[in-house]
Design a protein with these regions (language model features):
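Cytoplasmic-side transmembrane-helix entry/capping segments in multi-pass membrane proteins
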Residues: 69-77, 124-136, 184-193, 246
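Helix-helix packing/entry segments at the starts of transmembrane helices
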Residues: 19-21, 44-46, 86, 100-107, ...
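Transmembrane alpha-helices of multi-pass small-molecule transport proteins
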Residues: 36-84, 111, 169-173, 190-209, ...
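Hydrophobic transmembrane alpha-helices of multi-pass small-molecule transport proteins
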Residues: 55, 75, 115, 127-146, ...
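Glycine-/small-residue-enriched transmembrane alpha-helix faces in small-molecule transporters
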Residues: 1-42, 47, 152-179, 301
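Specific transmembrane alpha-helical segments of multi-pass solute transporters/efflux pumps
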Residues: 23-28, 56-105, 141, 227-245
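Specific alpha-helical transmembrane segments that line the substrate/conduction pathway
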Residues: 42-53, 90-123, 127-128, 166, ...
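Membrane-interface helix-cap regions at the ends of transmembrane helices
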Residues: 2-4, 22, 26-33, 37, ...
């Protein structure tokens, strides 16, 4: 691969990561009104089945290389990223605000980078550590309101814990997807993952918990948007980015989804954004900018 081609490929990777962040950032705002009307498990299953159908035209010509390793990987990816993570996320969202949920998505950055450094021997240069520290500092600001004297573990409600744990499983999904993306087309991974996860969730919701299929006609359009834009398109672009740039870079850029989520919650749900949230957003944006400007200092081993 020539230098120019490699540079263009990396630029595409950054562009795809930004698109994924914008699209996924809209999820909490779109989903918040729905989780009070549609059972979270049923909603998750519908979204992922829609996502699978959306990705089918892009993936139907792509082959899935048959091997025990690939089957185990896609199963693990599906269970972590399309069953456990969305279930916990939407259940937690039923009692959390859309803006809080958007901010907690930065937890995916922590877990994805931590797992990448622990198991895939990725390393950060000086600028990388500074950038990651800025992103982490932004999350600390929005979760504590800079009120450390009164902050206790008791203030972390169960819905917030569910959201945080969901980020752990999406972090596992991110790193496993990166492995499989080296051999399988990203559209095929996203399609199979969504189909398996959606089918499992549908079975659990309808046959396991007896959730009735009573979705109103007016609820279908936002569910379609969630499945097509919030998950199918964002997942596809995210995996495309993983294939072109490493997990650390992709996830740090993807952390901007929380900022887009904050803005969307403020505009469409009239949720108030405080000064410390604005401060945190600025810090995280600068961290991501620094990561891009000092890209050569990121040294995956």
């Amino acid at each position: 691969m020539g230098l120019t081609q490699k540079y263009d490929n990396m630029r595409l990777g950054y562009l795809f990561a930004i698109l994924a962040a914008v699209m996924f950032g809209s999820v909490s705002t779109l989903a918040k009104p729905l989780v009070s009307l549609v059972n979270p498990l049923l909603l998750s299953s519908m979204i992922y089945l829609i996502s699978a159908a959306t990705l089918t035209p892009l993936a139907h010509k792509q082959r899935f290389q048959s091997s025990k390793r690939n089957y185990l990987l896609i199963l693990a990816i599906s269970i972590c990223g399309a069953v456990i993570a969305p279930s916990l996320y939407f259940v937690g969202l039923t009692h959390a605000s859309a803006s809080d949920a958007a901010l907690i998505t930065n937890g995916e950055v922590f877990f994805s980078i931590l797992l990448a450094m622990m198991f895939f021997k990725e390393r950060l240069g000086i600028a990388g550590y500074v950038a990651m520290t800025l992103v982490l500092a932004g999350m600390i600001i929005v979760t504590t309101d800079l009120n450390f004297s009164d902050f206790t573990l008791q203030q972390i409600h169960y819905q917030d814990m569910l959201l945080i744990i969901s980020m752990l499983f999406w972090g596992i999904d991110n790193n496993l997807s990166r492995i499989l993306a080296q051999k399988i087309h990203v559209a095929k991974i996203a399609q199979i993952k969504s189909a398996i996860g959606g089918a499992i969730l549908f079975g659990i919701a309808v046959f396991g918990f007896g959730v009735p299929l009573d979705v109103e006609l007016s609820e279908i359009p936002p569910i379609l948007v969630l499945g097509i834009i919030g998950f199918a398109a964002s997942l596809y672009f995210f995996l495309q980015s993983l294939k072109r740039i490493n997990t650390v870079r992709t996830v740090l850029i993807f952390s901007m989804s929380s900022i887009f989520g904050l803005v969307a919650a403020s505009i469409f749900l009239q949720e108030q954004i405080s000064w410390y949230q604005i401060l945190a957003a600025g810090i995280m944006i600068f961290g991501v900018y620094l990561m891009n400007r000092k890209e050569s200092l990121i040294n995956p081993v």
